[in-house]
Every structure is written in C-alpha cells, then in structure tokens.
Amino acid sequence: MRECCPDSDAGTKFKVVVHTRELRLDVFRDGKLYKSYPVAVGKPETPTPKGEFTIVNKDGTPGPRFGARWLGLSAPHIGIHGTNHPQSIGRAVSEGCVRLYNPDIEELYWMLPIGTPVTII
C-alpha cells in the first residue's frame, strides 16, 4: 500500500499556477516550468477564487463527484480535483474548483506535497 501523501522529492520546490482565462495549470519545479495541464474552472456565477493559496490536504478517494483525487486548497471549499465528466475540461463550468482529467490529477497527487503554493490568476 502506498503512503497517502509522500514528499515527491525531498528538497524539490514545487509551485502551481492556475491560469483561469487560459484554462491551464502550470507546475513549476525549482523555479522552472515543469508541466502544463488543461483544466476546467468556475463558471461565471461561481468563479474560481483568485489569489495565493496552499495545498492543505489530500484525499485519495474523494468520491465520484471529484474524480480520482482531491488536493484541498487553503480557500474554503475549493480544491484541485479530477472529474468523471472529461468533456468539461477546457471550459468554465465548475462550482469554483479546478478540474483536471483523472490521469493528470493522479500525477499531481503523487507529485505535489501538502504545503505546495498555488497561485490562481
């Protein structure tokens, strides 16, 4: 059985930037762009909050509404998670969370430790 929340690489510094207009999530590793992922963000009536946050919790079995994994942010009731509606990726359709394809959130779940900074712009 794998650990819940391993540090991906001791000493490696990660940062996440979510671009709500471009519908993209970028991961920076030690200050350099490492990976980019397409996302869905909040719809106009429930926009994704902008600002500086951190990953405060992780859930490996969040239930069908949140896809394969959940990365909870320091913003109340907001997270980065998977989806069982892959057709929603690339659109502004969520209740404020950031959605990714399930294989992408699986990768981020194991890559990003709790405490990782997340900027949403």
What spans do the regions from the language model cover?
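Exported/periplasmic cell-wall-interacting domains
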Residues: R2-K13, K43, P47-F53, N57-I121
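A structural motif detector for short, solvent-exposed N-terminal "entry" segments of globular domains
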Residues: R2-K43
